[in-house]
Amino acid sequence: MRHIPRRRFGQHFLVDHHIIAEIIHIICPLPGDRMIEIGPGLGALTQPLLNNLDTLQAIELDRDIVDYLSRNYAEKLVIHNVDALKFDFSALGEGLRIVGNLPYNISTPLLFHLSRFSNLIIDMHFMLQLEVVERMVAQPSTPDYGRLSLMLQNRFEMEQMLIVPAEAFNPPPRVQSAIVCMRPRVVPVIPFGLEKLFGEMVLAAFSQRRKTLRNTLRHYLTIKDFDQLRIDPGLRAENLSLEQYSAITRHIHKIR
């Protein structure tokens, strides 16, 4: 099949067989796994995954690709022709392993969507822009550390596994990519009931990165509150750990 990648779907198809083999080794698919592939494309990962699995669920929006996959992998592949951003992953049960070469144009909102189902997930392995992965795994007091780091690290432990060069794709993207492994925390750092407050407060904290917390969180905390939390209000948002943001969230919830 000659499929022209569609820009509106952010399609870049993986074609490097050495890289594909490395990714499959990292994922380590096993018979009995309840595995889901998001954006299978022309099956670069699909076939080697199926070689190790009893069945594979695939989520693909492009109708032409769905037709191709249906013809070539009908026996063990279950295809959902839907937008992954709107898909209810709880419909597939629990103990899920999710993989995929995620479309670059929806990767961040899709990660936030998937985080809602973290209690049903064993692990996730995704191909993403390298700069996105670096932001996901970033630590405090580094340039890449920000809201994305905190929101995802609250739910997942994450590790950058492999850098994938642009020439491994057709067409080559303008950026490097990387494989990230995400494993849900047994218990999120922020309780589920406080995540909305946590997200709003973190958004405010990073709204002006060069300003101090005294300014960015002035609608949430007084100097007395900072003293009680033992946090220097002269610090910037990037200087605080997830645990410190957790303490701030709980404190705000208590005093409201």
Swiss-Prot record:
Its EC number is 2.1.1.182. Pfam families: RrnaAD. It is found in: Cytoplasm. Its main location: cytoplasm. S-adenosyl-L-methionine binds at H12, L14, G39, E60, D83, N101. One of its GO terms (cellular component) is cytosol. The keyword S-adenosyl-L-methionine applies. One of its GO terms (molecular function) is RNA binding. Keywords: Cytoplasm, Methyltransferase, RNA-binding, rRNA processing, S-adenosyl-L-methionine, Transferase. Gene3D superfamilies: Ribosomal RNA adenine dimethylase-like, domain 2, Vaccinia Virus protein VP39. Specifically dimethylates two adjacent adenosines (A1518 and A1519) in the loop of a conserved hairpin near the 3'-end of 16S rRNA in the 30S particle. May play a critical role in biogenesis of 30S subunits. PANTHER family: DIMETHYLADENOSINE TRANSFERASE, DIMETHYLADENOSINE TRANSFERASE-RELATED. Belongs to the class I-like SAM-binding methyltransferase superfamily. rRNA adenine N(6)-methyltransferase family. RsmA subfamily. This is Ribosomal RNA small subunit methyltransferase A. It comes from Nitrosomonas eutropha (strain DSM 101675 / C91 / Nm57). The gene is rsmA.
